[in-house]
């Protein structure tokens, strides 16, 4: 096992194997996860990757240090579904000339993105390091970060894309190993899964990089006329902008393997001339509701907001931390049956854990057994077995209760005690400042992460008079 792996093993969809995770640069671990397309409130299926990769983000920060992990999760705010929603919701105002389509689109995307942020915060998820919006990366940028138009130009120049019938398409036949992620070769490609077959395509599987916009539709000037990007090129640009041409981990739902992630790989590798886009590809399993596929036609389609704020599921609303635990009780790669019974089980389990954790006045050390379990391809079920054992051993003020409290905080559950050991925090801050002065960043980061696991958020600054580094803290709720 490489020292750089820190004992972490992850299942890689690309290789269909679980192997040691070795970052490209242990001081700059990089992860990209596909975020929401903001045309409608996120549904409970969307919640699963957000929660799963939040746990991985927390684990990576613990293993490599908070300052050494970059997590990018995008917002897709240009899409034909958004256009359709804007016309549906604001059609009369647009027809009356009171609102342009672009203004209506902005209202839809802002409202939906704001709700998404409220939802995921209630689910106990940390904010990603960066959250780029697709519309900010269409045209060449003043800061020189990757953009969609430049990537498309590179693909054309390298012989991997062509213009036809007002579109620019990726030539799948130009990439000999296209289909590597989904294990589909070109002979097996069938139309469907958001890949349209048209007469102007060289190959049935060729997909759109750029398409023309009507005068009313959102559009940007390009060498191929005023238009807008295809679905896949957006993530290739945003990941390259913040993580580089090759990075460590790319995540998302199982439904994105084909065509979205397959086409991301094709675009990025061919535009940059690299052998990979990301070294590890991770995908969470599908979600059913009460044993059936979630579908509006079946009447079992629920948004995160509905579960949190209304009584439409099980005749009651549900706390965000209950939804979080219910999602994590099943291994992320396995399918999950989301049911009232599962939520009730999660709520009862969480109640028992919290009751035991309350026996400790403050969080203790994070048990190595919890980290070991999570380091085995995010085996949350094994980590929860440790928590249940600690709950059984917990007594007033003992180590088991303190370790349980630390574990719950680390996993994103709010059990921070108001009774913080202030002297202990002060000593830890002093030690950290000494380590920073000695340029021992790794140990300084570890102290910060351990305090955060105990519910203590550090804030670094400078004394306005002396200019010396100072650190304040607050209880993170």
UniProtKB/Swiss-Prot annotation:
InterPro entries: Cys-tRNA-ligase, Cys-tRNA/MSH_ligase, Rossmann-like_a/b/a_fold, tRNA-synt_1_cat_dom, tRNAsynth_Ia_anticodon-bd. Gene3D superfamilies: HUPs (3.40.50.620). One of its GO terms (biological process) is cysteinyl-tRNA aminoacylation. One of its GO terms (cellular component) is cytosol. SUPFAM superfamilies: Anticodon-binding domain of a subclass of class I aminoacyl-tRNA synthetases, Nucleotidylyl transferase. A motif ('KMSKS' region) lies at residues 293-297. ATP binds at residue 296. The keyword Cytoplasm applies. Its main location: cytoplasm. It is an enzyme of class 6 (ligase). Binds 1 zinc ion per subunit. GO terms for molecular function: ATP binding; cysteine-tRNA ligase activity; zinc ion binding. It holds the Pfam family tRNA-synt_1e. Zn(2+) binds at residues 34, 235, 260, 264. A motif ('HIGH' region) lies at residues 36-46. Its EC number is 6.1.1.16. Keywords: Aminoacyl-tRNA synthetase, ATP-binding, Cytoplasm, Ligase, Metal-binding, Nucleotide-binding, Protein biosynthesis, Zinc. It is found in: Cytoplasm. It catalyses: tRNA(Cys) + L-cysteine + ATP = L-cysteinyl-tRNA(Cys) + AMP + diphosphate. NCBIfam families: cysS (TIGR00435). Monomer. Belongs to the class-I aminoacyl-tRNA synthetase family. HAMAP family: Cys_tRNA_synth. This is Cysteine--tRNA ligase. The lineage of its organism: Bacteria, Pseudomonadati, Pseudomonadota, Alphaproteobacteria, Hyphomicrobiales. The gene is cysS.
